[in-house]
A protein has these predicted regions:
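Structural recognition of the beta-strand scaffold that forms the well-ordered cores
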Residues: 158-162, 167, 204-208, 253-258, ...
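Conserved SGNH/GDSL esterase-like catalytic core that processes O-acyl groups on lipids
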Residues: 64, 132-133, 172, 178-276, ...
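Sec-exported extracytoplasmic/periplasmic mature domains
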Residues: 167, 201, 205, 260, ...
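Extracellular serine-dependent O-acyl
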Residues: 293-298, 306-343, 352-371
């Protein structure tokens, strides 16, 4: 009986201390190895990355942001801030795998161990939306005495995908259409955008966000939302407006715009405002990338009525643009029918994304002469 009371008392003491916020955090062993800061010049970044907050820490929140480096040694670890989220990692071009940074404190995750001694290459892609997690990459940890070496040059071919939840990879790892949104089932690596880019041997950026529209975000007011894609597009980080993005840092030869699913997915929309804002946004994109070919896409999710309206609008915009700009194009994905399954909340499944990539690839190969 005495033992039981002691255990109960200990439990109460711990609970009271936790409630008071006075729990002392554990002291962990120091990180062993050579720490390489995120600002190291031999680390390559693709995507919108900011060092404004801390010159040695890389901040980002768009899915598809990629970090690459070549290193000496037999192991590699990665440092991130607490709860940064999920990445896909690939070592020496082998099978990619998913890693997560979900600890309450700064995280260290092993990406590779027991590699043959020599030079190796790591590619790490952020595969979720980091708006609420505020992800930070803080560097790599190498074996003692080892260091980074010059990495192979990034591909000369560059693509930018501007999109919404489809391009993000919302629910792509789920196999149940009734599942809610979860970071655990979002994965940009598995999207049509990444598959297309890999197939074309191109680097790509993804300026995409679930729920975003060109004039009206998901289920927004008929008059539109102020925080739509045209407004967010100017900034380095989504929904953080203290740093404008320098478009000279990344000039793609190809831009694919896939916006409209959220604008038109619920009934309270104004098709004329959609067209007006799309025209203005197209001019903005052209002003940022004067030499790029721009393709306006329609996605696979809208119903027949809304999809028909969207296609008519984009066809008209394209025809008008082509009077003075011959490098504006159109492409429609086929509708998802359910035969390939659905991801979470009726979004495209992994197989549907593969089908989308298979549809888009021949069009882009011919358009860009990228064989």
């Amino acid at each position: 009986m005495k033992k039981v009371w002691v255990m109960m008392l200990a439990t109460l003491m711990v609970s009271s201390t936790m409630m008071a916020g006075n729990v002392k955090k554990s002291t962990t062993l120091p990180i062993e190895g050579e720490i390489v800061k995120a600002s190291h010049p031999m680390i390559q970044y693709v995507g919108r990355v900011s060092f404004a907050k801390n010159p040695d820490v890389a901040s980002f929140n768009y899915p598809g942001t990629t970090i690459e480096a070549s290193f000496q040694g037999s192991s590699l670890k990665m440092l991130c801030s607490p709860k940064t989220g999920y990445f896909m990692a690939q070592i020496d071009g082998c099978e990619p795998f998913k890693v997560g940074f979900n600890a309450e404190r700064d995280s260290v995750v092993t990406l590779a161990a027991a590699l043959p001694k020599g030079v190796h290459h790591a590619k790490v892609m952020y595969v979720i939306e980091g708006l609420f997690r505020k992800p930070e990459f803080r560097g790599f940890v190498l074996d003692k005495g080892c260091h980074l070496v010059e990495a192979p040059a990034l591909p000369e071919r560059k693509i930018e995908f501007i999109g919404n939840l489809i391009t993000c990879g919302y629910g792509v790892e789920s196999i149940n259409r009734s599942d809610p949104f979860e970071d655990e089932t979002e994965n940009h690596w598995l999207t049509y955008a990444n598959i297309v880019s890999d197939s074309l041997k191109a680097q790509h950026t993804s300026i995409s966000r679930s729920g975003i529209g060109v004039y009206r975000n998901y289920n927004g007011p008929k008059t539109g939302d102020a925080d739509n894609m045209p407004w967010q597009y100017e900034y380095t980080l989504f929904d953080q407006h203290d740093e404008k993005w320098d478009f000279a840092k990344y000039q793609p030869q190809l831009v694919c715009i896939n916006l409209g699913t959220n604008d038109l997915s619920t009934k309270n929309y104004d098709i004329q405002l959609y067209e007006k804002n799309y025209r203005m946004f197209l001019k903005t994109v052209r002003s940022k990338y004067p030499h790029a070919k721009i393709v306006m896409l329609t996605g696979p999710m809208l119903g027949e009525k809304e999809s028909s309206k969207q296609r008519t609008v984009l066809d008209r915009i394209c025809a008008d643009a082509n009077k003075t700009d011959k490098n504006i194009y159109r492409f429609d994905f086929s509708f998802q029918k359910g035969d390939l399954g659905y991801g979470a909340s009726w979004h495209p499944s992994m197989l549907q994304h593969r089908k989308m990539a298979a549809e888009l690839l021949p069009f882009l190969r011919k358009l860009m002469n990228w064989n």
